[in-house]
Amino acid sequence: MRTTGLLLLGALAELGSATYILEDDYQPNTWFDQFRFFSAKDPTHAYVNYLDQAEARSQNLIGVRNNAVYLGVDHKNVATGEGRSSVRLETKKVYNHGLIVADINHMPGGECGTWPAFWTTSSAWPMEGELDIIEGVNQQKQNDYALHTAQGCSIPERGDFTGSVVTPNCDVKALGQAENQGCLVEDTKGSRGYGPDFNNATGGVFATEWTDQAISIWFFPREDIPKDVNSEHPDPSKWGKPSAFFGGGECPIGKHVRNQRIIFNTAFCGGWADGMWPGDPICSKKAPTCMEYVRENPSAFEDAYWSINYMKVYQQGTAPTKPSQAPAPPSSTPALPTMKSTSTVSSMVSATQPAPTASNPTGAPMQPSSSSSNNGPQPTGGNGNPGDSCPPPTQPACRTYVTTKTYTLVSTMMPSGPQTTGGIVPVPSAALEDIKDTAQRLRRRDMERHSRRGHHN
């Protein structure tokens, strides 16, 4: 049957889209509550004394300065014992996958003897991997991205990324590569991504997307940071080519990188920086060894500090989207076959009519009962009670006919618009009256057919 109004037969489902949703927000005012302080002996044999939180605070090596996290080193005293005092912070939380976004104003680096890093690793190294997002030694100019794994992971030497692959095998024991070198990608954006030039340009953002298939790392200088990087739902697909890419068919990331903590630290000398010292034309002239230079020159490391605006970790999920607004519907139902929906409505239709007489040969009903099956049959019998469709017993006996009918309603579903509330489209009163009138006509027709054919109860 047709109606001239719009009918609402169901609520519109809220749509959602797969995107990144914020899981952990590392801000300066809560930063030190979310990290643990590593204070054991450095595993890379660095000349460094890592302090616990209380001692680091007492020596003013940590804090919040200019609304940013400050992580510094001792730059006032000649080093003794295990080395120059510094800090190594690791997230209390362990991660598997995610989007890690860090906004950094200033980093250590560019000074002889320093070995700063922003990285992730697992307690089951190298089986569960290590990822270096920022790392360098001595007077290095460009940032190095690296992945360290067990055997069975190699990356393509060319691909959809901007960096330059130095070594392709991520295995820390790979033949033909330095021990623990892993797969190394050098940033080709010049010196803006590391050390003094990074600091002079007020830093930038490092964003790392880690999935089962691949790890991609972007570096954005301050003036090139995408608008959505610090939004509720950042979208890496809009950021262009990453600086580094680890993955592909020769490296199942889901197998090799798991259970990672995020780490910031500043070390001195150690395996990498020590090894580079003799061949460094500038550093090697300052002292015979890296350790001697770091020990005797505290003021050289005043600028060896991290200043971090924030770090955020996102995970993929489904974010709700609001239904779009639509113009007010027209006064009559338009022909929109792509939006058409049908609903089958079954109900018990009950009506009472007088028996056929000379004055009423068809026995047409005097008044229909409710059109809703929820109300049930109305009282019958000709007593004059409320709801009785028969007049008082001055006429012949009444007969009650009950028919069961199934109707199919065809309606046009329209999006919610300004005239709606909460996405629910109201049914115009004119449309409801249409339904009632049509239902009455159908009942009269049914009663006439029953009467002619002699069907009654």
Swiss-Prot record:
EC number: 3.2.1.6
Presence of the UniProt keyword NADP in the record: no
Region (Disordered): 318-397
Signal peptide start and end residues: 1-18
CDD domains: GH16_fungal_Lam16A_glucanase
An example Gene Ontology molecular-function term: endo-1,3(4)-beta-glucanase activity
Gene3D superfamilies documented for this protein: 2.60.120.200
GO process terms (BP): cellulose catabolic process
Keywords, ordered alphabetically: Carbohydrate metabolism, Cellulose degradation, Glycoprotein, Glycosidase, Hydrolase, Polysaccharide degradation, Secreted, Signal
Protein function: Mixed-linked glucanase involved in the degradation of complex natural cellulosic substrates. Active on laminarin. lichenan, soluble carboxymethyl cellulose but not on pustulan.
Designated name of the protein: Endo-1,3(4)-beta-glucanase ARB_04519
Source organism (scientific name): Arthroderma benhamiae (strain ATCC MYA-4681 / CBS 112371)
